[in-house]
Amino acid sequence: MAGPQLNFLTLACADVERMADFLRALGWDESPESEPVHRLFQGTNGIVVALYGARNYEQHFGPRADGFRGFTLGLNLAAPEDVDRVYEQLQGIDGAELLEEPFDSPHGFRGFSLRDPEGNIWDVAWKRGSTVTPAGDLTWS
């Protein structure tokens, strides 16, 4: 039996609407169940990304850390040219800070990193030998 699957990711946001605009710019579909303070986006492979006001979490867990938060969010793509397409798509998007241009690594990757409007780091990449289905299922090899 497979272990539990990651299928719901919540991001605490100081500006929920700005972050929602960012996800829409990536082409993600917003759920009709969204509310102004609680936005839901359907990603690929069944994952749901929820955006909540940061104050709700700070009351429960304490203040958010500034700077790198110890994790990155990954968008794995089906082909190396998709990396360049997404890079072009993100140029000029409010709050998307492109940290580097797409590059080829000696480890078989093509990718780049960006910071979203809330300061989260995203890695956008293609990896030689891996497959991504149209539904977004990733097979890592």
Kindly label every feature range from the protein language model:
Residues 21-25, 86-91:
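Short amphipathic alpha-helices in soluble, non-transmembrane regions
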Residues 2, 5-14, 41-42, 62-141:
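Vicinal oxygen chelate
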Residues 26-27, 81, 94:
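Structural motif
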Residues 56-62, 131-133:
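A short, acidic/glycine-rich surface segment
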Residues 1-21, 73-75, 127-141:
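N-terminal beta-strand motif that seeds the catalytic metal site of vicinal oxygen chelate
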Residues 10-57:
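Core segments of cupin and vicinal oxygen chelate
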Residues 20, 59, 84, 122:
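Alpha-helical elements of the RecA-like P-loop NTPase motor core of helicases
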